Structure formats: structure tokens, C-alpha cells
Amino acid sequence: MYNYRKVTDDLYWVGGDDHRLSLFENIHPIYHGVSYNAYLLMDEKTVLVDTADWSVGRQFLDNVEGVLGDRELDFLLINHVEPDHAASIPEILLRWPNVKIITTEKAAMILRQFGFNIRPEQVDEVTEGDSRCFGKHTIAFVKAPMVHWPEAMVSFDTTNGVLFSADAFGSFRALDGKLFADEVEFDKEWLDDARRYYTNIVGKYGPQVLQVLKKASTLPIKYICPLHGPVWRKDIPYILDKYMHWASYEPEEKGIMIVYASMYGNTEAAAEVLARKLCEKGITKTRLYDVSSTHMSYLISDLFRYSHLVLASVTYNLGIFPPMHNFLMDLKALNLQKRTCAIVENGSWAPNSGNLMKAELEEMKHMEILDDEVSITSSYRENNESDMDALVDALVASFNKK
């Protein structure tokens, strides 16, 4: 059964939605599913741009055959070989054995590492600055290494301004019949998923993304066709601006995240006191997160959004409570930087988590750590009030800086 949509007069979306997968990359929850996008250009020569995960393989192949009709598939253009986009390549090769593959040298190498039977003469290796003409359409190739795999490239159709952006500009969430970003309320329905996708999948590679954005800024882009999520044909500066913030690690907006690690509720109670005092001072853009029950991908995503972070952790085995430690390791791995941070520690006989959390933050780039800290012994009491008030004042002063 065919279920494809037109992007332009001769370009079709031939992907599929997956509502069954619960964990993207077997780690990130996707409660609203995910789309695997592929595109088919019907020029004098036919060009399939990327394939799809095998979970939607049947729908994808039906769509390709539905658009092709009685025509042959001439070219398979591969921008990115991660299995969620490359898994259907063997079936494409079985159905159209004479198809010519256009991709990078490194992509061809990785495909063979995955066991794909690709003949050397079948591959047309391209690199930065190359282009290929398929009739009316000419597609130019731009290298995008480590966005977010080393073989990645993006492709630009110079005829109608279509950027095939691989995993850049993608998003979690199934399309559910929609195709274009202007068919949804993106700010309300999609932005959080797009941010969570970028920050957790691509977030480590901000400098590389900035290089791609710099190249993209010179192109007359009219459409952005990513491998996940909606196609952009309007408000393209909006999503480019979001990517500039995320890739440069600049907060989107001012806000204070209070992430707490609490075994029996005492550190949580202190975090709630802090939140109340901040709100009483007018800082209502304040959010609390239990690091033990909030999936890491949501914490990472919101920290790319907000400007301030308070870490409140109980001491555990003379160290940082393990889920909090894992959170800090993820922040370091994803290269998060340019945030203002504060520390609240707790411990019944040897509170030590504060110094250890501070040491981890100091290893990160451009992190401002406020001098005011709160150290609790077992539970928050009146003797902690003055230190907490000092911390609140420091956070308010930092928050209100221009």
C-alpha cells in the first residue's frame, strides 16, 4: 500500500513512521514515535536519497515502487549510513541490482563493515565540491563529518534549493500524515522533541555543526529535508537560529534548572525550599527534576535550553549519588558549556558531594560556578537558612544580569 507525499513537483517523501519503537538507539524514550525519511527524485534519471530503518522497510519499499511506477531506479544517494537509515539498502540492491550508489569513500567503507554486498564498480565516490546532474536537477555534495558520524555529508539540489540534511535538523516524533513543519504548531508540539533529538544525538559536535551551518548560510535554501521529522519550506531562519544556539552552547532563554538526587526526600525538600525562595524573588522560570526518575535525555535537552543549573546531591559512599554522577558524565560527554552553576550538598556524617560535583563542573568549558554553596547535614534546618538565602541572592543577581 502506497503512502507517500510530494515535497516538490518531482520530489517525493517515501519514508515511514515507527510507532512501535520505545527507545531510539535503545536509550532515548520516544513516546510519540519517530519518522524515517527518504526522498525520491523523478528527473530524467531517478534518484533515491537515503533509505529507511527495516522497521518501516515494507512501507518504504512500497512507497518507492509506487512513485517509480514502471521506471527503473537509477541512483541511490547515501548521505548517512547509520543503520536506521541504511538498513533497507540490501533490499534496494536486490530489487534494482543495476542501481548506482553515490556516497563518500568512508560511507562505502562503513557499509561494507556492516556486511553489505556492494561491488566496487557500483559506487560513485564523491567529496566536497563534487556535483552530479540527473537531467534538470544538479545535486552538489558538502562534507559534514561528525554530524554526527564521520562519513556524513549533506546534498544540495541547486535547481530547486532543496537541502538533504542527513541527521541535521531532525527530530523525534512520528509525522502522522503531516510532512511540513508549517503543517504543525512546531513551537508547541515539536520544538521540545527537536531539541531533545539534537542535544542527545548531535549535541557533542557543536563545532562541526557550526561548520555545516556556515556552509549552509551561503546556499539559497528553499527546503530542508532531514532524515527524521518534518520538512522545512517556511520559516527556515527559525530552525537555523535554534541550531546556532544549540551548536554554540548558548542558552535559548534564561531559566534555572534544579536537579536533585535524594534518597529519602531530605535533599528533595531542600531543593523545593530553594525553588520557593527563587520564585518569591520573582524568578519563576524555575524547574525541579529528580535525577533518579527523569530520563537523562530530558535533563540534557532542558539544560541546552536554560541558562542556570543547580546541582543538589546527597553524598553516597563518600561520593556523588550515582544517577547524579551519570548526569555529570553525560554533560561532559556532550560538551555542554556556558552555564552558571550552583551547588547544594547533603550528607549525614561526611558531606562530600559538593566538592566532587564542583570538580566535575570545573573540567567543563566556560562554566561559571557560584561561590555561595549550601551544605546540609541529614536534613534542611534553620541553621541552613542564611546559606540558602545567600545562594538565592547570588542566583538572582546572576539571573538578572544583561
What are these regions (language model features)?
Residues 88, 294-299:
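Short acidic active-site motifs
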Residues 49-51, 73-81, 101-104, 163-167, ...:
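Active-site neighborhood of phospho(di)ester-bond hydrolases with catalytic His/Asp-centered motifs
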Residues 225-252:
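Short N-terminal or domain-adjacent regulatory/targeting segments
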Residues 4-65, 154-157, 161-165, 267:
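Conserved beta-strand hairpin/beta-sheet module of binuclear metal-dependent hydrolase folds
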Residues 175, 186-224, 229-231, 273-289, ...:
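FMN-binding flavodoxin-like domain, especially the glycine-rich phosphate-binding loop
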Residues 5-9, 102-152, 205-211:
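Metallo-beta-lactamase
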Residues 148-152, 168-203, 247-252:
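Active-site-proximal loop/helix segment associated with metal-binding centers of metalloenzymes
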Residues 44, 55-102:
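Active-site metal-binding motif and surrounding structural segment of the metallo-beta-lactamase
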